[in-house]
Amino acid sequence: MAFTFKQFHIDDMNCGMAVGTDSVVLGAWAQLTAAKTVLDIGAGSGLLSLMAAQRSQAHITSVELDTSAAEACQHNFHNSPWANRLTLVNSSIQDFCQQIEYQEYFDHIICNPPYFEQGTQAIQSQRAMARHTDSLSFTALLDAIHVCLAPQGNASLILPMQSMARFNEILAHSQLSLIEITNLISIVGKSANRVLCVLAHKTHPQIAPKSSDITIRELSGQYTQTMVQLIRDFYLKY
C-alpha cells in the first residue's frame, strides 16, 4: 500500500510490515530533534527514518536486512525532500556493527523491533522476518545499540507490553539502562498494550525511569488531543 504524509510518501508494497500506528507514534515521540546522527535499525519501508529526517537536521543511516524492503526503502528515500541526508545499508545490524568506527557513533538510535519470540511464524517470509525476534533477538538488539550508541546518546524503541518482562530481564544483563517509559493505551479505559522506551548507556548509581501514559483514541474512536498533537505534523487530516 501507499501512504502520503504531509511532507513525504511511503510505498510499503514489498515490506514485511505495513505502515502502522506503532511506528508513527514512535517516530513522532522519539526525542531526536537535536540529534546530528540517527541510526534506524530494521528500517523496513523507511518510515521512521523519514520521520526523523522531517523532525531534525540529522544524517540518518538506515539498516535493513531484507533486500525487497531495502529496495522499497531506497525508493522512498529518493522521492523524499531529504535524500541527501538518508543513507540505506542493506545488511544485518550485526554485520553493520562489526564495521562501525568510533567516529560513526550515533546520537540517537530508533527501532520498532520484531516482537513475537515464539509461536507460529507468519506464512509470508518477509512478514515473518519483520514480526519475529528470530531475525533480531532482544539480546542482539541491545548489543547493537551498545556498540553503535554515542556515550551521551539515547535509543528509542516500541515494544508490546507482554514482551516487557523478558526484555527487562535481558536488559538487566546488558550495558544499557531504561531511563524513560511511556505506556501506550489504545483506547480510553483499556490497559496499555505497547510501551515506548528510551535507553541509554548504564550509569552508576542507576535511577528509576521516568514514566508517563499516552492514550491513542477516545471511546468515540476519535484520536485524543494528546495523539493529535503528536501526529499533526505528519497526518494530512490535521
Curated annotation (Swiss-Prot):
GO cellular component, one term: cytoplasm
PANTHER family: TRNA1(VAL) (ADENINE(37)-N6)-METHYLTRANSFERASE
Keyword line: Cytoplasm, Methyltransferase, S-adenosyl-L-methionine, Transferase, tRNA processing
Name of the featured protein: tRNA1(Val) (adenine(37)-N6)-methyltransferase
Alphabetized GO MF terms: nucleic acid binding; rRNA (adenine-N6,N6-)-dimethyltransferase activity; tRNA (adenine-N6)-methyltransferase activity
SUPFAM superfamilies: S-adenosyl-L-methionine-dependent methyltransferases
Domain of life where this protein originates: Bacteria
Role noted for this protein: Specifically methylates the adenine in position 37 of tRNA(1)(Val) (anticodon cmo5UAC).
EC number(s) stated in the UniProt entry for this protein: 2.1.1.223
InterPro entries: DNA_methylase_N6_adenine_CS, rRNA_Ade_Mease_Trfase_CS, SAM-dependent_MTases_sf, Small_mtfrase_dom, tRNA_Adenine-N(6)_MTase, tRNA_adenine-N6_MeTrfase
Source organism per UniProt: Shewanella baltica (strain OS185)
Xref: Pfam families: MTS
Family: Belongs to the methyltransferase superfamily. tRNA (adenine-N(6)-)-methyltransferase family.
Localization of this protein: Cytoplasm
Reaction(s) this enzyme catalyzes, per UniProt: adenosine(37) in tRNA1(Val) + S-adenosyl-L-methionine = N(6)-methyladenosine(37) in tRNA1(Val) + S-adenosyl-L-homocysteine + H(+)
GO biological process: tRNA processing
Gene3D superfamilies: Vaccinia Virus protein VP39
